[in-house]
């Protein structure tokens, strides 16, 4: 995946070994521009959960390698955090991991009368994401999906 300013594959190759060496999962990396500032956001996860100290530890190590290799020419803020309880499902791996869990599917356009559908993630393929909603299967075209969020259990 290529960003206008940076090569995300290169960033991933630098960061992933560090995160894994510290016994965390690299959940996702994004480089975004918000309010005229650039942010490199690194989401980490662990079966034990993530706390502030975990984020600080990863941030220090990642910051060192990014300063050394300097893969981003523009100035940016580095943020390390947990993906949260109601996390966005970005990848096929995420969808696979959370199959049979409650999700919220946010859509760009109306589909079956709504821009948001909530249900149990049953399956997915290249074309559709299938959820079970009120004992009915709904096949949602992937090209209409803006975001899929894991529904947190409170």
Swiss-Prot record:
Domain of life: Bacteria
Example of a GO biological process term: ribosomal small subunit assembly
One CC-aspect GO term: cytosol
Keywords of this entry: Cytoplasm, Ribosome biogenesis
Subcellular localization, as worded in the UniProt entry: Cytoplasm
Bilayer-crossing regions: none
Pfam families the UniProt entry points to: DUF150_C, RimP_N
PANTHER family reported in the protein's UniProt record: RIBOSOME MATURATION FACTOR RIMP
Similarity field: Belongs to the RimP family.
NCBIfam families the UniProt entry points to: PRK00092.3-1
Role, per record: Required for maturation of 30S ribosomal subunits.
Protein name according to UniProt: Ribosome maturation factor RimP
Species for this entry: Clostridium novyi (strain NT)
